[in-house]
């Protein structure tokens, strides 16, 4: 009996020891967890104290560097204020401090304490296209030669500049796309932007025309400055005839401001390095009214005509716009043959209208008859509109 009590007593003692060891491990784990939480909270407290300290700092003045002196000093000018000779803080990188740089000045000592980014008009920042266009070269039909010339002038210098170095020639600075409306000029620029890993800046010529003197020219200058900072860059100026029309001797105040904007554009295109990673593409429907200075070599070196598509081009465009459509017994060559004089935009509208006719008839496929009715609706409406305009001009002059 005694031996049994001793065994029971020993077993209970061992179980109690095991329980205590397990409890110790649990407490040690809790301690490590609490220590980790403490370190995290201390880091958060330190960050918040630093943030509070920064928020309590007095505001700094913004100024412009006029001249950098040798002995860690510089001449700066506060906006619309006097000039000061001030100290340069030791953490400022001297090689980045140049005349014209925007800097932050300490409120008490006026010392330069920070380099500020270049000032830009908010509208210039809005010109940048953040998301790449989804248009590819396969989405453009009937313009193989024009696309090849555009890629040689824009894509090749950006991707393989060493080829031009080896041959010993300068790549084109700019490309002008001209031709009737709806023939794919903007589409070509989008396709290039999609295939080149570059910043794409799109601006319409009329957006550069401003009310007050010098604003348009300043906008053009800031546009090219942003392009250099974000290089490689493609600048696409649509409807360039809004600022690039021929200059006349007799001009009004508004026309003079447009001329100033044009002259700034000419100066910017002359100024940047042709082997630099900034390329300019422009598009217009009216090449006949453009200023000759804009078209001379060294500015827009390559002029690419984008004409109305011929039979083969119309057939290729129709294939592009119908490749996702459910067609039944449709001969696209017949549609291409009867749409002579139609632009790429007209052909896209015809494909869309043919699909609409099928939807009206509660069908999930498109037939030849749908396309014939669409041709009559799209091109017939254009002819009727042209006749109405001609009759109006005859009646009212």
From Swiss-Prot:
ATP binds at residues 182-187, 321. GO terms for biological process: proteasomal protein catabolic process; protein unfolding. Consists of three main regions, an N-terminal coiled-coil domain that may assist in substrate recognition, an interdomain involved in PAN hexamerization, and a C-terminal ATPase domain of the AAA type. ATPase which is responsible for recognizing, binding, unfolding and translocation of substrate proteins into the archaeal 20S proteasome core particle. Is essential for opening the gate of the 20S proteasome via an interaction with its C-terminus, thereby allowing substrate entry and access to the site of proteolysis. Thus, the C-termini of the proteasomal ATPase function like a 'key in a lock' to induce gate opening and therefore regulate proteolysis. Residues 12-58 form a coiled coil. One of its GO terms (molecular function) is ATP hydrolysis activity. Residues 395-397 are annotated as: Docks into pockets in the proteasome alpha-ring to cause gate opening. One of its GO terms (cellular component) is cytoplasm. It is found in: Cytoplasm. Homohexamer. The hexameric complex has a two-ring architecture resembling a top hat that caps the 20S proteasome core at one or both ends. Upon ATP-binding, the C-terminus of PAN interacts with the alpha-rings of the proteasome core by binding to the intersubunit pockets. Belongs to the AAA ATPase family. The gene is pan. Keywords: ATP-binding, Chaperone, Coiled coil, Cytoplasm, Nucleotide-binding, Proteasome. It comes from Thermococcus gammatolerans (strain DSM 15229 / JCM 11827 / EJ3). The keyword Phosphoprotein does not apply. This is Proteasome-activating nucleotidase.
């Amino acid at each position: 009996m005694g031996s049994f009590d001793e065994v029971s007593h020993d077993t209970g003692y061992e179980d109690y020891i095991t329980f205590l060891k397990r409890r110790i491990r649990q407490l040690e784990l809790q301690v490590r967890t609490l220590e980790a939480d403490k370190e995290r909270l201390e880091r958060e407290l330190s960050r918040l104290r630093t943030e509070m300290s920064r928020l309590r700092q007095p505001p700094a003045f913004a100024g412009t560097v006029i001249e950098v002196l040798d002995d860690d000093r510089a001449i700066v000018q506060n906006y619309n204020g006097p000039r000061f000779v001030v100290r340069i803080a030791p953490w400022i990188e001297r090689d980045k401090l140049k005349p014209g740089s925007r800097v932050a000045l300490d409120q008490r000592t006026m010392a330069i304490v920070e380099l500020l980014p270049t000032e830009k008009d908010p509208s210039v920042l809005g010109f940048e296209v953040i998301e790449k266009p989804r248009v590819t070269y396969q989405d453009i039909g009937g313009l193989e030669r024009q696309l090849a010339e555009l890629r040689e002038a824009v894509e090749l210098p950006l991707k393989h500049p060493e080829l031009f170095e080896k041959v010993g020639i300068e790549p084109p600075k700019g490309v002008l796309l001209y031709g009737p409306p709806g023939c794919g000029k903007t589409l070509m620029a989008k396709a290039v932007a999609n295939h080149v890993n570059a910043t794409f800046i799109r601006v319409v010529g009329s957006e550069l025309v401003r009310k007050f003197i010098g604003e348009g020219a300043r906008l053009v200058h800031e546009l090219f400055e942003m392009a250099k900072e974000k290089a490689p860059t493609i600048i696409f100026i649509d409807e360039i005839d809004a600022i690039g029309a021929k200059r006349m001797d007799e001009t009004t105040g508004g026309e003079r401001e447009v001329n100033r904007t044009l002259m700034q554009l000419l100066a910017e295109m002359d100024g940047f390095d042709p082997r630099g990673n900034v390329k300019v593409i422009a598009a217009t429907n009216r090449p006949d009214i453009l200023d000759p200075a804009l078209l001379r070599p060294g500015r827009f070196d390559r002029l690419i005509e984008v004409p109305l598509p011929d039979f083969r081009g119309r057939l290729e465009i129709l294939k592009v716009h119908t490749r996702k459509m459910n067609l039944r017994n449709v001969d696209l060559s017949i549609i291409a043959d009867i749409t002579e004089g139609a632009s790429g935009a007209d052909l896209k509208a015809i494909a869309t209208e043919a699909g609409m006719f099928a939807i009206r008839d509660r069908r999930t496929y498109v037939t030849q008859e749908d396309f014939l009715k669409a041709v009559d609706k799209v091109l017939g409406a254009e002819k009727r509109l042209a006749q109405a305009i001609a009759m109006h001009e005859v009646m009212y002059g």
